[in-house]
């Protein structure tokens, strides 16, 4: 609310992107803040139906449209049109956090760790789902994961492909970057 208030006072239109409504209440919190500021007519909350970089891709497009002078309504319509084209997925290095988040049992996390399983998590229709399980050393898994996405990557807007990671070895990131540049 504190972030919105100065813009509301200036009478500006505000567009907020939330993590997928099925994963978080952040969108609802933003809508409630707009109501409390009596600015529901000036604040548009867009359910990204995604997370992390998937939201970022939509925000980049919205910023481009805003710089072209588009209204919040025009931007919202354009974002809703590209939302189904946004792909976000990742491979987890450990099942510990999936277990802690209630997404897998303790037995599955233990067995998966012993077998060196690394599930590919995809965001589909605003929800996370495991689409494939890789097995082995993380560096090999990530390269296999990248190769499995080749068709989607070839059809992507080249300057909108992100390598998003959390503490991944620099060598792995560079290997993925090199692979992508050769596509």
What are these regions (language model features)?
Residues 15, 22-44, 50-183:
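Mixed-charge interfacial surface used for oligomerization/domain docking
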Residues 1-7:
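Glycine-rich oxoanion-binding loops at beta->alpha junctions
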Residues 7-13:
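Glycine-rich phosphate-binding loop signature in dinucleotide/nucleotide-binding domains
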């Amino acid at each position: 609310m504190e972030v919105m208030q100065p813009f509301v006072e200036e009478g500006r239109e505000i567009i907020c992107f939330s993590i997928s409504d099925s994963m978080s209440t952040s969108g609802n919190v933003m809508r409630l803040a707009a109501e409390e500021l009596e600015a529901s007519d000036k604040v548009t909350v867009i359910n990204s139906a995604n997370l992390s970089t998937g939201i970022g891709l939509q925000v980049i497009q919205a910023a481009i449209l805003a710089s072209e002078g588009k209204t919040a309504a025009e931007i919202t319509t354009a974002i809703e049109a590209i939302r189904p084209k946004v792909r976000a997925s990742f491979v987890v290095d450990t099942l510990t956090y999936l277990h802690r988040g209630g997404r897998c049992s303790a037995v599955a996390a233990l067995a998966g760790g012993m077998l060196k399983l690394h599930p590919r998590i995809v965001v589909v229709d605003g929800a996370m789902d495991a689409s494939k399980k890789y097995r082995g050393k993380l560096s090999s898994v990530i390269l296999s994961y990248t190769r499995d996405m080749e068709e989607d990557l070839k059809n992507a807007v080249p300057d909108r492909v992100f390598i998003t990671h959390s503490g991944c070895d620099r060598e792995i990131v560079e290997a993925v970057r090199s692979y992508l540049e050769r596509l």
